[in-house]
């Protein structure tokens, strides 16, 4: 049972990255970035497809050389998800991939070069109807801003962003989004808050170089969660030193927790204690693995005893309240006469979830045998 989020989103303009709308109330897009060698076309295509299968809306690909630009052309021809080309230092690479059907160009103000070079990139983007992302990063600010501020600060990131926003404005180009990422949560959040007050272009959120799977997920959840709860953000990436597929899962989990966008199962599970009537931890691990393919938004509560089990089940699509030998089953908040054998919880609960979704989609329900 999913209710609407109370969050009032910041108003922003609309751009399109391929067929994905960004800003102006569009669903917050979740994206990741490949970590393969772009020159290895087969490996990169395979990873893009895996990221897409995980639910990504957009994938970014690093294009560091002209040879990589040629590889990008082949990659683009083999995938269907919108691709963003990540461009640093050599603006001519952006001009090349623009001809190859890229869906968005990411440029870094800290290293892309002079206004003349930016003008060339804008001209190519305009010619091919491609949006641009101005990607400011606390680790690669322009040298003069480093000297002015001494160290990265929200004001420094804002000045870098606005410097290039104003260039695009002078060039009468408004098809762009902006990010002001940093590895420090407060630095990034402060910069995004300042930027959100200055412009109405879509904002791409991220805590850059957040860390490994655990620490990076926590840091991203805190930082992105603060901004999203304030209505700031139109697209996001969770940056992890991990499999990019995990970035998509964590990204959707963050949106799901704020009731902004739901995909797949929202599990509600107790941490377990001596009152548990079945092994909650093992049950959850198995259910998460077996139901990973589900994309339909469904809330499932798995509580090991009757203290909180019935209450959580009342607000879940499917709920399990632990009891001796056979646990209570709830569907749409209503307790069922049938009960679930504690020795076979995973198989039976999986069946109920799939049956629930089949009925919701008007498909043939699965026949589940339940111990009465």
Swiss-Prot record:
InterPro entries: Dihydropteroate_synth-like_sf (IPR011005), IspG_bac (IPR016425), IspG_bac-typ (IPR004588), NO2/SO3_Rdtase_4Fe4S_sf (IPR045854)
Any one GO biological process: terpenoid biosynthetic process
Pathway where it operates: Isoprenoid biosynthesis; isopentenyl diphosphate biosynthesis via DXP pathway; isopentenyl diphosphate from 1-deoxy-D-xylulose 5-phosphate: step 5/6
Binding-site residues for [4Fe-4S] cluster, renumbered to this chain: 270, 273, 305, 312
GO molecular function, one term: 4 iron, 4 sulfur cluster binding
Cofactor names: [4Fe-4S] cluster
Cofactor, how bound (note): Binds 1 [4Fe-4S] cluster.
Keyword annotations of the record: 4Fe-4S, Iron, Iron-sulfur, Isoprene biosynthesis, Metal-binding, Oxidoreductase
Enzyme class of the recorded protein, top EC level: oxidoreductase
KW Heme (keyword) present: no
Gene3D superfamilies given in the database record: Dihydropteroate synthase-like, Sulfite Reductase Hemoprotein, domain 1
The enzyme's E.C. designation: 1.17.7.3
Keyword 4Fe-4S (UniProt): yes
Catalytic activity: (2E)-4-hydroxy-3-methylbut-2-enyl diphosphate + oxidized [flavodoxin] + H2O + 2 H(+) = 2-C-methyl-D-erythritol 2,4-cyclic diphosphate + reduced [flavodoxin]
Family of this protein: Belongs to the IspG family.
NCBIfam families found in the cross-reference section: ispG_gcpE (TIGR00612), PRK00366.1 (NF001540)
Entry function: Converts 2C-methyl-D-erythritol 2,4-cyclodiphosphate (ME-2,4cPP) into 1-hydroxy-2-methyl-2-(E)-butenyl 4-diphosphate.
Name under which the protein is recorded: 4-hydroxy-3-methylbut-2-en-1-yl diphosphate synthase (flavodoxin)
Source species of the chain: Pseudoalteromonas translucida (strain TAC 125)
Gene: ispG
């Amino acid at each position: 049972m999913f209710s609407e989020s109370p969050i009032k989103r910041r108003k922003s303009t609309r751009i399109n990255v391929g067929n994905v709308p960004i800003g102006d109330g569009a669903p917050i897009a979740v994206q990741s970035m490949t970590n393969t060698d772009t020159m290895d076309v087969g490996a990169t295509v395979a990873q893009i497809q895996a990221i897409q299968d995980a639910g990504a809306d957009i994938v970014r690909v690093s294009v560091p050389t002209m040879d990589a630009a040629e590889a990008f052309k082949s990659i683009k021809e083999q995938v269907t998800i919108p691709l963003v080309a990540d461009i640093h230092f050599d603006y001519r690479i952006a001009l090349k991939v623009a001809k190859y059907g890229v869906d968005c160009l990411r440029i870094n103000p800290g290293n892309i070069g002079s206004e003349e070079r930016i003008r060339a990139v804008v001209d190519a983007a305009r010619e091919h109807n491609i949006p641009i992302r101005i990607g400011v990063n606390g680790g690669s600010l322009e040298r003069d801003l480093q000297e002015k501020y001494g160290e990265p600060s929200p004001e420094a990131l804002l000045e870098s962003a606005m410097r290039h926003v104003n260039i695009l404005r002078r060039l009468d180009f408004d098809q762009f989004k902006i990010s002001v990422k940093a590895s420090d949560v407060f630095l990034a959040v402060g910069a995004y808050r300042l930027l959100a007050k200055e412009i109405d272009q879509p904002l791409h959120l991220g805590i850059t170089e957040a860390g490994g799977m655990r620490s990076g997920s926590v840091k991203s959840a805190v930082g992105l969660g603060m901004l999203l709860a304030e209505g700031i953000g139109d697209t996001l990436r969770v940056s992890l030193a991990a499999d990019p597929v995990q970035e998509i899962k964590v990204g959707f989990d963050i949106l799901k927790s704020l009731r902004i966008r739901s995909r797949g199962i929202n599990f509600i599970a107790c941490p377990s204690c001596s009152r548990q009537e079945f092994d909650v931890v093992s049950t959850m691990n198995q259910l998460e693995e077996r139901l990973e393919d589900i994309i339909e938004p469904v809330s499932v509560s798995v509580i090991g005893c009757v203290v909180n089990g019935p209450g959580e089940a009342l607000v879940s699509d499917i709920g399990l309240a632990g009891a001796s030998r056979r646990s209570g089953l709830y569907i749409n908040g209503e307790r069922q006469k049938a009960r679930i054998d504690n020795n076979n919880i995973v198989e039976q609960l999986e069946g109920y979830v799939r049956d629930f979704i089949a009925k919701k989609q008007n498909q043939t329900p699965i026949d589940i045998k339940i111990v009465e």
